[in-house]
UniProtKB/Swiss-Prot annotation:
It is found in: Mitochondrion matrix. The keyword ATP-binding applies. It comes from Dictyostelium discoideum. InterPro entries: Aa-tRNA-synt_II, aa-tRNA-synth_II, aa-tRNA-synth_II/BPL/LPL, Asp-tRNA-ligase_1, Asp-tRNA-ligase_1_N, Asp/Asn-tRNA-synth_IIb, AspRS_core, GAD-like_sf. It catalyses: tRNA(Asp) + L-aspartate + ATP = L-aspartyl-tRNA(Asp) + AMP + diphosphate. This is Aspartate--tRNA ligase, mitochondrial. Gene3D superfamilies: Bira Bifunctional Protein, Domain 2, GAD-like domain, Nucleic acid-binding proteins. Residues 1-61 form a transit peptide.
Amino acid sequence: MNRVILKDSKIFLNVLNKPIIKNKNCLSLLNITTSSTTSIIKNQQINQFNKRNFTNTINNNKNENINNKILNIIERSHSCGEITSKDIGKEVIIYGWINSLRNLGDNVFLVIRDGHGKVQCYVDLKQQCILKSSVPNIDINERNSIEENIKLFKLESIVSIKGKVIARPERMVNKNMSTGEIEISVDQLQLLNNCVDLPFTVEHDSTAVSEELRLKYRYVDLRRDKVQSNIRLRSKVAMAARNYLINQQFIEVETPTLFRPTPEGAREYLVPTRHQGQFYSLPQSPQQYKQLLMVGGIDRYFQLARCYRDEDLRSDRQPEFTQIDMELSFVNTQMIYRIIEGLVKTLWKEAGFNIDYEFPFYTYEQVLSTYGIDKPDTRYDMKLVDITDCFNKDETNINLFKNALSQASNNFKESKPVIKCIKLDQVLPTLKSKHLDQITTESNSIITVQIKSNNEWKSLISKSISEQEKTLITERMNLKEGDVLLISVGPRFQVESTLGKTRIYCANLLKELNLLKLDPQQFNFLWVVDFPLFTPSDYMNEQSALLSTHHPFTAPHPEDIDLLLNPLSTPSDYSKIRGQHYDIVINGVELGGGSIRIHNSDVQLRVLEKVLKLEPHMVQRFNHLLTALSMGCPPHGGIALGFDRLCSLLVNSNSIRDVIAFPKTSGGKELMTSSPATVTKSELDELFLIQK
């Protein structure tokens, strides 16, 4: 029974494969029912239905039996992937795509694929098999042989099959298929829809086809086994997250996606309205709404939230993305760590991985000092080591070091001059000079030192460095023949940032050269805590403006609250305040971050006005939040995990585009529908927008 929806009358028509009788310019359809009660439809309504919906199907100049082409979909008995040896002898009905088709003598073999798997079917050319076509322009010629007619069935066409499950001969069992022990002997094969030549084959290796082409025809790319697997795992993980959080007494609440513009950090997408000068913004996160839910007594909230940020894109970013967003009342950091570790372990278990250790903690100072980045990959070594004390600024003959160490610093500890290095252990001679050139090209402030035999140093500084300096560094770094040393000198924030990026670049280079091997199923989780609450816009300028390290709603560390409230505090004092912020990191990827929030309106107002020095009109944008905080707001905190990024880690992909059904390109374009698109002048005028 086919069910067609009339747009105008909103009446469901149940077409029962009964004759359609031409009556002047209208159709008389038999057995017309509504979803509730039987209705009489006027000829005019049916004329409209005929004109709008059957124009491309019915050719009035041809005397054809339309009824033969009307589909009568019978419920399938099995999906393609669920038929097993337990079903041998049963008659089954399946639907799917023709994945492959081979003519082998007296048999034609078809592998049929649906969203649940694949199954092999065969047509015995010596036996009776009914072939049908429901495609208007493709007819089965009864005069032709089955072999001739089956040529009409192209790869990726949609078919239905009715047949009997039989056991494969033992030598023909395919252990690579879940249905490899059986096959279906076809009694009836019906073509439901044909397929034109595709831009690429569904069986292709993704590296053999450009990503641009795959995204343009994403609906074809989605048929690939790998993409199907990714999307289905994403669904399973989402359900596991919901179940876990609901069991932890959370409730799921949807917050608005039309918000008001607020200065939270990243650039927002603005949504014009038909009211002149009035704009919505798409939320960068549900941050303010979820805090307001805590004011409203929701206690524990979560949602799989859609978020939007108009920023430069990379492989792990999209203009619209999803996060597992959470907020809790009457909570401290330890409670959040415990809940999130439990959630992460649950989600990894759903994907087939067992995480059985407690996540270690690092302070922000520790990770920057040791790894040069606040989201370190701890699966490999190459730690930053401070060798500043190996040089005396008054005695060293290395002018670069002498000048750098003589530079004055200010009250920002990040401006202090340092010399740091990382060691590439036993990489020579595989690591060639061209590779070292690549490293220095990537960062021109890096000095390379190759350790040759007899502790000979090959470097730009080898003639200037003293034996004492060389000995101190050799002992500090435990240098051996075949090692490479990468040195950077300058203000601390520059040195650590440079070496942090160089460490990542070197790790990728060493992986390409098979000098570093990482297990794709090794997951090194860690927490980073004690971030600075505020960050100077310029470490070299003591009077530079301060920015929120994360967002302006993060609460200060209890031990540092006096620095925030002291009216005599300076920017350098504010920069020493630690925030109650925490990031969860895995294998060099920030999986999520959160904080305990400011729940007092006076403290929140001081942050906005006195520390961040927002203009009054900017502060006014937060009036709704400030008012709510003054009306009995409980202490609260929360966190958000990047759901797309989480799923990409579970499928061992470097790009979140691989786990999103319809992703944007790195340029923010959606190639399939050519989005974003231009609009007409009249549409712009309606929104009071002027195109320059």
